[in-house]
Amino acid sequence: MRGLRRGLSRLGPRLGPWAVPRSLRRVLRAAGPWRGQSSAGSVSERGGASMEEVLSRSVPLLPPYETKEKAPPPAERRSAEFVRYYRGLEAGSRRAELLGCLARDFGADHGRVAEFSAKVLQAREQEREQGALLQAEDRVRYYLTPRYRALFQHLGRLEGGLRFLVELRGDLVEGLAAKAVDGPHVKEMSGVLKNMLSEWFSTGFLNLERVTWQSPCEVLQKISDSEAVHPVRNWVDLKRRVGPYRRCYFFSHCAIPGEPLIILHVALTSDISSSIQSIVKDVESLETEDAEKITTAIFYSISLAQQGLQGVELGNHLIKRVVKELQKDLPQIEAFSSLSPIPGFTKWLVGLLSSQTKELGRNELFTESERQEISEITEDSTTETLKKLLTNSEWVKSEKLVKALHSPLMRLCAWYLYGEKHRGYALNPVANFHLQNGAELWRINWMGDTSPRGIAASCGMMVNYRYFLEDTASNSAAYLGTKHIKASEQVLSFVSQFQQNSKL
């Protein structure tokens, strides 16, 4: 393992961002050597087995259907050999090659699938007894199972195996995103492993843990490293985020104790916050909290700490568990809400301005009076000037521009969250997450995030998704079933203004 760490540190600058994924770095720090592996050695390609040999030995053959219940499990040493070999490969191209080979050459037996699919059709046409039809269907299901699934299944039962599978899927996810590994077989394997991890990481196996300043340093460091929404600036900032009027929780797994899987930060306030700076920046540090002042819980950051668990439903369960925990500890809390970023809004808006200018020769997202007011301030009426304005943060330094852009950007943002869809659901991923959970699209906040990052991503706007606990189940069912978005009067008013004033 030390050799692997040294190799990764040397290779990192040369192989680029996929070389040492953040999820892998965390696993390497915490995992230690694999059982049966000395800290100095792993199977390498120099003088060792070839990739094809390792895969052939490690991936068990699918036994005949008739003997599937009697087939012995694969030898533990073969699975351990696979782990050692994988961890000994260069992160990046060589791992991508192995994953591609595993997905392509050790998948389902398509010949058998075709054979027994034909028998299912034959049984239906001949109207044979129900038992024969069900058995034929069962054979199809059996041969649809990819061979690599048995390897994953066995690895999941070994000590340290679940941690390794999360690491491997993290490499798959990051490799697919970087196009380092691609193709339908690889995407299918990533999906198969995701479904297996969803079962292993179901709520019954998860522990809810609260982070305080007295938590182990390793945990505090992981909380800081994993913060993806509002980066932690220093230890003072971190201490504030786990101190009075703040809560930080994470899920861990019984097989990977103490390792954060997904993290939720909560601010305890007297009202529904409209600005993230009031929560994470320049906040007076208090030694104690007055419970009587707390009436509201604000979920202001939720971050997945393990890339390999992407797509596994953890966030909704974490919020529900935290709500129950807060209700038990602080029963006076009346309101639960998020204070969420709006990633992608600026990019969407600039793209829309470009397409309108190209198709219509003019910008019709803003009213004539709004265009006139902005052109008087900028001394330029072209759409290109407006696009440049929105893609840098200089405009927020002008009070006149901030005032002039307030109304058009608020209604455009409302439409982006409420009206822009992907397959019928909200295009914005954060909106889709909270709406699936049953929250209400409640309030859009002008200048809710005045950091450079917030200005660049969403023109400084943030949004509250309210969790009315008595309505979350029905809201979620309506959104998932009929794609209906529950929204407040404020949001619907802005949407109506957009439909009246803007042309798409």
UniProtKB/Swiss-Prot annotation:
The active site is at residues 340, 434. Its main location: mitochondrion. It catalyses: malonyl-CoA + H(+) = acetyl-CoA + CO2. This is Malonyl-CoA decarboxylase, mitochondrial. Pathway: Metabolic intermediate biosynthesis; acetyl-CoA biosynthesis; acetyl-CoA from malonyl-CoA: step 1/1. It is an enzyme of class 4 (lyase). Catalyzes the conversion of malonyl-CoA to acetyl-CoA. In the fatty acid biosynthesis MCD selectively removes malonyl-CoA and thus assures that methyl-malonyl-CoA is the only chain elongating substrate for fatty acid synthase and that fatty acids with multiple methyl side chains are produced. Keywords: Cytoplasm, Decarboxylase, Fatty acid biosynthesis, Fatty acid metabolism, Lipid biosynthesis, Lipid metabolism, Lyase, Mitochondrion, Peroxisome, Transit peptide. It is found in: Mitochondrion; Cytoplasm; Peroxisome. A motif (Microbody targeting signal) lies at residues 502-504. The gene is MLYCD. Its EC number is 4.1.1.9. The keyword Cell membrane does not apply. Residues 202-504 are annotated as: Catalytic domain.
